[in-house]
């Protein structure tokens, strides 16, 4: 591509360079990376759409940069007048260009982080974004800290590590707003950029990489960013599973090798046993039916079979490599006898359909004989799952397949033992050990599927049963009566109902789900989670339904407490459950409880939710200890701060003491999956962070808060909840204001997830799901649900006694939980901009509601000031120049998209809004005989004026990418 250097075009570089704060060090290549990607992109844009369009992008960027300098509302209006003068086709191209530039800025940032990590100039434990995290929980560092600072012996560390489990639960929450087709192209752009800056690159390599970089940037820009149909749960499952294929499958053994190395460095010569459950994976995709009518029993069945087929395929693809390696002839007697037996029973022509080792394997290669048999079984296991998935039945006999994990591990363990006993331990600890570790981690099911259902749906089923049996209405019984009946049925043997039970569609759906659980292998499933659980009968009901539907190995039942009142009542509910003898005997000393971050935040605001979650965990652990039960907390965190997100290791280290105890389950949601597992190095970093932080929390628990800190926070939480609820639930016109001032009503058009955005189609804020609630406020850069309530709470305690300010500063310095809470809010303020929110108000909100918006913005400014006072900071993010720089580099792009979104919403909602269009500026559109049509025709069914809907969706995606948050 001609290397045009138009005078005008140099200015984006200039702006970028001016934005860099002086403090950022020499090793920082971010601006260089950013400028390179941008230059390439603008060249491509000019080639495709002409110089005029490139100049318009430039002009918009400059207006935005000027606004970022002084925050004058006039600048936003100038931006608006340029944007509204564009014709529909150009408008789509511009929105797409800015969205694309933000994605490129994110990629530049990721490459820069990897570069800085390599040159070891990392400060440990800063507070920043998850994705950029210079926040580290490095295993080597953690081990050194535990041995050096805490005098833990290497043996104690090894013991704790062998017995700890982190279970990462992938959920397809509708927050992954980037299409998979684009994610793959982004990965290749990242690779090209990293290689371009490698030390030993030749001129030819450089030229080829540069061409590849341009090709990938153009391919990404030419891909439709918008999903034209909503994904089904099966699509979500396949998208989630693709991460296993791409990074997790190979990432786990690689990570466990690094654990071995780190242990060796502190003097432990043993390796982590291959069956130590250090990392486990579960999934909600296709199992989470809470409020999602599209997740049917058939979907659950399909998803389990698909995962089994994928697991068998990945093992099968690896087994031949292992056979190549295992060419040894020395073996112990046990293996020799088995190999002879397998050889005698094998058919000569049985292996014709394999590429390698297709003839009968001689007994002089005993390991290959054994592994050949494993290969046959894997082949049949895969075929059977494939046939069951395709047509519901299979002609592959079950005995030709692997039925359970023990059966799969047994021949591999035999090979391992034999190699060790013949002096070939180093060989055993090679690929065979990696394979054993994969089998132990992924099993035959790849992931274990959790089932989640609302407690009301179980009540409906039991009510139908008791009504049918003429013993009354279960729904109307008291909790005592319910428990008494459930326990008498659980202790008895008779079946409760037959095929004559009258069933509505909903009841059949619940019962059929239990039948699917009974039909499929037990290792396909993890937990049965009950949302909106409040009482012991909710848990006993699921136990009874599992028994009635003949589930041979019942799933563990996990109550989920989400709303503030439910969290407060959770310890008492769990204590009542443990006091039921039947249940206590059933659980074998182990119980899991899930706590929800999203709904509690929507219900009471971030401060009260965070504090209540902290207290509920402390209380739950006390209750469990009292009854001699080991409790696992399952954290339902979202990606955004409003939904419990934030850097992993800080989140773990700020949990109350004693609440993790080497066993942690946590959801990895939506776009966080891509940030955690999108690349090999990200996957490694994620596994390392979770493992190191869980170990550190157990061996070096955070301090318990002082009684006076608790009392202060209790008082603050009451004030914060009062203010939050007085605005969100009690202000009569709030819902109207929210719907006008944000793109909430238009959110559903993004086709991100398979779940409806509301629990009930009518209804106000209560029925809105937490994700669109947060999404809408994130889009306007106002982030209301995150900070609302903090300001009045801090102001209240300082006005009451000025010494409380010192106490708050003391809490910030010495109490990890409080520090993390305040730091997260500070980061959100750094991403916020009330000036942008004011533009939405001016354009979209009716005039009589303007004072309401002004009041909220004044509250934003006051809260920001008080948060800085509490942290002892003069300026937002003053302790983290890197994050500050990165946010400033993104702001000008995001501002253009915000203004574009606000004016587009105005035109969608008010068709009579007058705009003066200028002629086409895109060369591609102007020179085409069908002007602007092509882009607009991608969305032929839009009910709005041409191009508006696509422009709106592109701005939503761009802003989400820029803030690195969707919902």
UniProtKB/Swiss-Prot annotation:
Its EC number is 4.1.1.31. Its cofactor is Mg(2+); Mn(2+). It is found in: Cytoplasm. Disulfide bonds: none annotated. The modification Phosphoserine is found at residues 11, 704. GO terms for cellular component: apoplast; cytosol; nucleus. Keywords: Allosteric enzyme, Carbon dioxide fixation, Cytoplasm, Lyase, Magnesium, Manganese, Phosphoprotein, Photosynthesis. Optimum pH is 8-9. Its main location: cytoplasm. By light-reversible phosphorylation. Activated by inorganic phosphate (Pi) deprivation and glucose 6-phosphate. Inhibited by L-malate and L-aspartate. Induction: Upon inorganic phosphate (Pi) deprivation. Through the carboxylation of phosphoenolpyruvate (PEP) it forms oxaloacetate, a four-carbon dicarboxylic acid source for the tricarboxylic acid cycle. Contributes probably to the adaptation to inorganic phosphate (Pi) deprivation. Belongs to the PEPCase type 1 family. This is Phosphoenolpyruvate carboxylase 1. It comes from Arabidopsis thaliana (Mouse-ear cress). The gene is PPC1.
């Amino acid at each position: 591509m001609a290397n045009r250097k138009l005078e005008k075009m140099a200015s984006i570089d200039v702006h970028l360079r001016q934005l860099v704060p002086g403090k950022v060090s020499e090793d920082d290549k971010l601006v260089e990376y950013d400028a390179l990607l941008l230059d390439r992109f603008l060249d491509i844009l000019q080639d495709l759409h002409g110089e005029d369009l490139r100049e318009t992008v430039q002009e918009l960027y400059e207006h935005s940069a000027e606004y970022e300098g002084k925050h004058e509302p006039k600048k936003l209006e100038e931006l608006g007048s340029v944007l509204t003068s564009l014709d529909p086709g150009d408008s789509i191209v511009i929105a797409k260009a800015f969205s694309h530039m933000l994605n490129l800025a994110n990629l530049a940032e990721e490459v820069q982080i990897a570069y800085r990590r390599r040159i070891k100039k990392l400060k440990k434990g800063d507070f920043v974004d998850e994705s950029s995290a210079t926040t580290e929980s490095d295993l080597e560092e953690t081990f050194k800290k535990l041995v050096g600072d805490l005098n833990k012996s290497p043996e104690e560390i090894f013991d704790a590590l062998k017995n700890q489990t982190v279970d990462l639960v992938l959920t397809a929450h509708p927050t992954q707003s980037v299409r998979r087709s684009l994610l793959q192209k982004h990965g290749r752009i990242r690779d090209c950029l990293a290689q371009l800056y490698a030390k030993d690159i030749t001129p030819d390599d450089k030229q080829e990489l540069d061409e590849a970089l341009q090709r990938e940037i153009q391919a990404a820009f030419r891909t439709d960013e918008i999903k034209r149909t909503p994904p089904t749960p099966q699509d979500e499952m396949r998208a989630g599973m693709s991460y296993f294929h791409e990074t997790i499958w190979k990432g786990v053994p690689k990570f466990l090798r690094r654990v071995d190395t780190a242990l060796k460095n502190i003097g432990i010569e043993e390796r982590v046993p291959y069956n130590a459950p250090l990392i486990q994976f579960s999934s909600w995709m296709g199992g989470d039916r809470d409020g999602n009518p599209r997740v049917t029993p058939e979907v659950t069945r399909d998803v389990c079979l698909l995962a089994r087929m994928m697991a068998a395929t990945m093992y099968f693809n690896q087994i031949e490599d292992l056979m190549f390696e295992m060419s040894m002839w020395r073996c112990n007697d046990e293996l020799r006898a088995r190999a002879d037996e397998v050889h005698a029973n094998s058919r000569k022509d049985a292996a014709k359909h394999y590429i390698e080792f297709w003839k009968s394997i001689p007994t002089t290669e005993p390991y290959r004989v054994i592994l050949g048999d494993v290969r046959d079984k894997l082949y049949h296991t895969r075929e059977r799952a494939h046939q069951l998935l395709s047509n519901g039945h299979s002609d592959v006999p079950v005995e030709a397949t692997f039925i359970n994990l023990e059966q799969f591990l047994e021949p591999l363990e035999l090979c391992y033992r034999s190699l060790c006993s013949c002096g070939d331990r180093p060989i055993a600890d090679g690929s065979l050990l990696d394979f054993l570790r994969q089998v132990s981690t992924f099993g035959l099911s790849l992931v274990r599927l959790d089932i989640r259902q609302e407690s009301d749906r179980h009540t409906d089923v039991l009510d139908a049963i008791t009504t049918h049996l003429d013993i009354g209405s279960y729904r109307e019984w008291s909790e005592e009566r319910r428990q008494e009946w459930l326990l008498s049925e659980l202790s008895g043997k008779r079946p409760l109902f037959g095929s004559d039970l009258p069933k509505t569609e909903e009841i059949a759906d619940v019962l059929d789900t239990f039948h699917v659980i009974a039909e499929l292998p037990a290792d396909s499933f993890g937990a049965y989670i009950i949302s909106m659980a409040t009482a012991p009968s909710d848990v006993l009901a699921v136990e009874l339904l599992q028994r009635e539907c003949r589930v041979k190995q019942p799933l563990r039942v996990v109550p989920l407490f989400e709303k503030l009142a439910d969290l407060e009542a959770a310890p008492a509910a769990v204590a009542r459950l443990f006091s039921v003898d039947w249940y206590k005997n059933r659980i074998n000393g182990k119980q899991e409880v899930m706590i929800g971050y999203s709904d509690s935040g929507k219900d009471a605001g971030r401060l009260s939710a965070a504090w209540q979650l902290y207290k509920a965990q402390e209380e739950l652990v006390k209750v469990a200890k009292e009854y001699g039960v080991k409790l696992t907390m399952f954290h339902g965190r979202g990606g955004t701060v409003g939904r419990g997100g934030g850097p992993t290791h800080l989140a773990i280290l700020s949990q109350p003491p004693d609440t993790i105890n080497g066993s942690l389950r946590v959801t990895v949601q939506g776009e966080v999956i891509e940030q955690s597992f999108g690349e090999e190095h990200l996957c490694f970093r994620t596994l390392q962070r979770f493992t190191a932080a869980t170990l550190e929390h157990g061996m070096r628990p955070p301090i318990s808060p002082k009684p006076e800190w608790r009392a202060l926070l209790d008082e603050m939480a009451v004030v914060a909840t009062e203010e939050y609820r007085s605005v969100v639930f009690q202000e009569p016109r709030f819902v109207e204001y929210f719907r006008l001032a944000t793109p909430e009503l238009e959110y559903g058009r993004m086709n991100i997830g398979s779940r409806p955005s509301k629990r009930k189609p009518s209804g106000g804020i209560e029925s809105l799901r937490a994700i669109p609630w947060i999404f809408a406020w994130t889009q306007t850069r106002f982030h209301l649900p995150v900070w609302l309530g903090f300001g009045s709470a801090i102001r209240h305690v300082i006005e009451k006694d000025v010494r409380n300010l010192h106490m708050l500063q003391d809490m910030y310095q010495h109490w990890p939980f409080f520090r993390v809470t305040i730091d997260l809010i500070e980061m959100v303020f750094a991403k916020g901009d009330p000036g942008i929110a004011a533009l939405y108000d001016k354009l979209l909100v009716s005039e009589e509601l303007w004072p309401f918006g002004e009041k909220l913005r004044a509250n934003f400014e006051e809260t920001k000031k008080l948060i800085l006072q509490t942290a002892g900071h003069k300026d937002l993010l003053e302790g983290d120049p890197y994050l500050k720089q990165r946010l400033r580099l993104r702001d000008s792009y995001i501002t253009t998209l915000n203004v574009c979104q606000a004016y587009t919403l105005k035109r969608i909602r008010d068709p009579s809004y007058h705009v003066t269009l200028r002629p086409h500026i895109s060369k591609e559109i102007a020179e085409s005989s069908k002007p602007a049509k092509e882009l607009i025709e991608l969305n032929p069914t839009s009910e709005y004026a041409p191009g508006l809907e696509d422009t709106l969706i592109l701005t939503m995606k761009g802003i989400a990418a820029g803030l690195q948050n969707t919902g």
